[in-house]
């Protein structure tokens, strides 16, 4: 199964898409016992891919929780995805996902024309969150601050702050109620940060 997460704007857009030739991936349940691969009568019920944490016996529960944590660590290590844009020489870094990341890219292009170099880190996966990528971008020489731009009231903001861990100031700009942040608003926010406001 594939799950696409999209905001309201992306969900209503249409544009040409090039799909690569389909590859039929066969998942070996023995290699990924955590994956929900379906179950049919006659299969071993213990291998259904159901995540269960209702174990009355504390020792069994402890072993099970250790196994889950090992899975989470493996997923975190191998499944982070993100895009970096215009980070080289950036004075400011924007973090944004979904539609807002597209708008932020337009703002970055226009700010560059005004002599302000801004980069972007766009998480493709929000879990596992690309903490190291955000941290690395923020710690580049010359980066003064990070602006988190979202189409909400900061659902990703805490993760951005955790990634940066106080190394640089983090500011936030967002909108609610289907009101989209504009290129001009993002530019104005970066300019106000540059001016120390």
Show which residues each predicted segment covers.
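Short acidic, glycine/serine/threonine-rich loops at helix termini
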Residues: 13-20, 105-106, 133, 158-161, ...
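Conformationally flexible catalytic loops at phosphate/diphosphate-handling active centers
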Residues: 1-84
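Peripheral docking tails and interdomain loops at the edges
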Residues: 150-197
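Generic long, charged, amphipathic alpha-helical segments
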Residues: 105-137
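Gly/Ser/Thr-rich loops at beta-strand to alpha-helix junctions
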Residues: 9-11, 97-103, 127, 152-156, ...
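General beta-strand structural signal in soluble alpha/beta enzymes
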Residues: 3-6, 120, 148-149, 172
């Amino acid at each position: 199964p594939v799950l696409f997460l999209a905001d309201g704007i992306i969900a209503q857009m249409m544009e040409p898409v090039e799909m690569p030739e389909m590859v039929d991936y066969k998942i070996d349940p023995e290699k990924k016992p955590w994956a929900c691969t379906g179950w049919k009568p006659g299969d071993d019920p213990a291998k259904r891919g159901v995540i269960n944490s209702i174990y009355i016996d504390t020792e069994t529960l402890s072993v099970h929780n250790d196994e889950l944590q090992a899975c989470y660590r493996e997923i975190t290590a191998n499944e982070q995805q993100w895009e970096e844009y215009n980070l080289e020489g950036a004075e400011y870094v924007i973090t944004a996902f979904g539609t807002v990341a597209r708008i932020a890219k337009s703002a970055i292009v226009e700010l560059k024309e005004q002599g302000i170099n801004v980069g972007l880190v766009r998480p493709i996966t929000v879990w596992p969150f690309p903490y190291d990528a955000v941290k690395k971008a923020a710690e580049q020489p010359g980066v003064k601050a990070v602006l988190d731009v979202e189409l909400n009231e900061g659902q990703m903001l805490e993760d951005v702050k955790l990634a940066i861990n106080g190394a640089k100031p983090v500011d936030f700009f967002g909108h609610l109620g289907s009101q989209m942040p504009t290129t001009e608003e993002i530019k104005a926010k970066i300019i106000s940060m540059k001016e120390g406001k």
